[in-house]
Structures are given as C-alpha cells and as structure tokens.
C-alpha cells in the first residue's frame, strides 16, 4: 500500500461514531494511545485533541480481533500514563489480541511512554522509540489533600456517620494509611510482574 492509501484506509476505519469500516484488503490497524490513559468521551480514536478514549479504543481492538483482513497493530504511544484500571485493562486487551489472533503488534513510543504508557508499550513484539522518548517510570501513586487546617480556619466542621470503622477516610488513621499502602504495593507488584 502507498502511504496515502494507507492513511486514507486508516481514516476510513476510524472515522465516525465508533464506526468500524475497514478497507477491503489486508491492513494494519493503528491504535493511538495519546494523553492520559483514563476514560473520557469522544467519537473517534483519530481525534486525539481530547486525549485517549478508553472505551472507544477497547471496542476498536475488539473489532480488529474479529476482522480476518487485519494483519497486525501499529501501537502509537504518547502517554505519561494514567489510571491503573484503564492502563492494565488496555495492556490485557492487547495481550488478548495477540493470543487470540496470533498477529503482531509493533509499538512506536513518541514523546512519552511512561508508567501506564510503558505498560501498554511492552505488549509490542517490536518496540521503536525516538532517542528523546521519555520512558520507564513504573510506579503507582495514591494521593489526596488534607484540608482540615483550612476547614478549621473557615469554621467548617466535618461530620461523618458511617457503618464501619474504615468507611470514612477523610481523617486517615494509621490503620487506613497501612491499608492504602498495601493496595498501592499490590498494584505496583502487578505492574512489575508484567
């Protein structure tokens, strides 16, 4: 295929509201992972102005799996990472694509392929990166704000009535910090084991 024909075919495949209209001949599907990996709303995976679209991307990969004319995936990654759930689900979907179809994935890492972007990239049979690509940075973070001082200064009193000791996490106890740390450690270990 010429570059123009391939670009037109990719545009045709991805244009419209989740419309999957692949070319009549063999083709390589392009999966864009651009921006923060989390669920957002948009109608086309070609439109990267709003960032990565999780459900749209997952549906697109399902369509590629079902299409015998598809001969592989070019995975374009330009992402600093994102949510643990969506990153791991995307990784697992790409692994499923390879295992189900036996077709290859080629990964191209652009500006960033860090954290969840790295997790996604490692599904490639071949990985290509620019010499200036920022990659790696595997890790998991959970954070929040302690606004108690501000509330006190403004005269705002927080009241919480719960059905269990660990239901309210607005004023973290040592036990709750340990629980959250255990969850972060577990997610990190899953990441390392990929």
Task: Name each model feature, range by range.
Residues 1-103, 112-194:
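Small-residue-centered hinge/linker elements
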């Amino acid at each position: 295929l010429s570059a123009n024909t391939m670009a037109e075919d990719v545009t045709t495949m991805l244009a419209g509201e989740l419309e999957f209209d692949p070319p009549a001949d063999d083709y390589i599907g392009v999966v864009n992972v651009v921006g923060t990996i989390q669920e957002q709303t948009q109608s086309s995976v070609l439109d990267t102005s709003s960032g990565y679209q999780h459900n749209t991307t997952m549906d697109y990969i399902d369509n590629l799996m079902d299409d015998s004319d598809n001969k592989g995936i070019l995975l374009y990654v330009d992402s600093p990472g994102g949510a643990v759930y969506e990153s791991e689900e995307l990784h697992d979907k790409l692994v499923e694509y390879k295992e189900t179809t036996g077709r290859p994935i080629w990964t191209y890492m652009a500006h960033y392929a860090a954290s969840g972007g790295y997790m996604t990239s490692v599904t490639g049979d071949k990985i290509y990166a620019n010499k200036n690509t920022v990659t790696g940075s595997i890790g998991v973070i959970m954070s929040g704000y302690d606004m108690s001082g501000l509330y006190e200064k403004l005269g705002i009193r927080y009241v919480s009535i719960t059905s269990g000791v660990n239901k309210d996490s607005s004023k973290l106890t040592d036990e709750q910090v340990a629980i959250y740390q255990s969850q972060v450690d577990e997610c990190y270990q899953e990441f390392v084991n990929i």
